[in-house]
Amino acid sequence: MKTLATLIITFCLALTPVGIIAGQRDADPEGDGFEAKLKFETREIKLGDIHGSDADRSFSFIGVNAGNAPLVLTYVHPSCNCVRLQYPREPIAPGDTLRIQGRLNSHGLSYGPFRRDIIVRSNAAEPKIRLLLTGTVSPDSID
């Protein structure tokens, strides 16, 4: 029994480095020093107080390819259908800026604070970035 326990522990310890190595993500798989780096001016836009009658609220996230390889946005998706997005589909050259523009339609939102995520996936060193829209929907005042 003691031999079996020793054998199991030895086997687990032998496989630990394999699991660690397999779990590492190499941002530069070719090892050639070229990689895209996506940097945003801000990752959160505070839309403030939105009245129920406000149909749409526009916003823009501005980023730059701070790497030395072309940047390709492979997936840009909001957390709800109340957000419509426009973003560049073509590769962004190193040093160039990009703009993710959108409109938030507040009609489907409940009154009170809200938080909506926008997931951006790309070939950058940080492959997944979460952008955030926050604000508060309030009822129209009765005058």
Label the model's feature ranges:
Residues 66-69, 108, 124:
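Short, acidic/polar linear motifs in exposed loop/turn regions
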Residues 59-65, 102, 116-121, 133:
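Buried hydrophobic-core signal for structured, non-transmembrane domains
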Residues 21-66, 134-143:
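Beta-sheet-dominated interaction scaffolds and their linkers
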Residues 110-139:
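Terminal connector regions
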Residues 68-97:
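Surface-exposed binding patches on compact interaction domains or structured appendages
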Residues 100-108:
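Short, hydrophobic beta-strand segments
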